[in-house]
Amino acid sequence: RGLGDVYKRQALLYLPKSQPQDLYHPDRKNKLKLYVNKVFISDKLESLIPAWLRFIPGVVDTEDLSLNISREILQNNAVINKISTAITKRILKELSELKKKKPDEFLAFWKNFGPVIKEGLYEFNDFHDQIFDFSIFHCSEKDEMITLDQYINDYANDKKKIYYISGENKENLLNSPQMELFKNKNINVLLITDPVDEFWMPMKMKFKEYDFTSITKGEVDLEDSKDDKKESEQPKENKDFISYLK
């Protein structure tokens, strides 16, 4: 499809349904082919798409480059950079739409490629908000995976924290000793099982005004949670009566 703005270009991209065997291989490159006026130029142009979208195959055709441009110049070319930005924005927009319109199909896609896309969260780029828009995580209070916005909307806490715990699998994390206090207080905790999350969460630190906070590192203060606050605001005679009943 056309990618807009002043540059004349078209791109035909595909969302794969299964992982390529070399997805995590260090030498894995993107699978995009670049054409200029329908003449093939290169299929080894790393700057055409971010590494964390390397699983997206397709073709890009532009009229804004010379047919005899060298590969070295292509790697740091303003037109290529514009095309890369436009392609990336379009892919992320389509993924956000897929999540909204076909959640089951998106979930299958996310299980295969979510960890790769989240590599983009520990890179310096302008796409973090778009990635967060559709990124989903396991959590302690629901069986299905949730977005960070869902966490905030459904389980907002007065500490302005997004609590998480990381480990090898969901079951072990749910049975972790550190989880007991949070379960007792009905505080939702993200269950982080993708190794990539342990890289970007400490770096990102915040989502909107909420801090990412590991429940296994340092002291987590829950004393001012809403339930505790409600109890502390009760009149003294009510507290005495409750204590008597206990």
Functional labels for PLM-detected ranges:
Residues 1, 5-246:
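Conserved GHKL (Bergerat-fold) ATPase module
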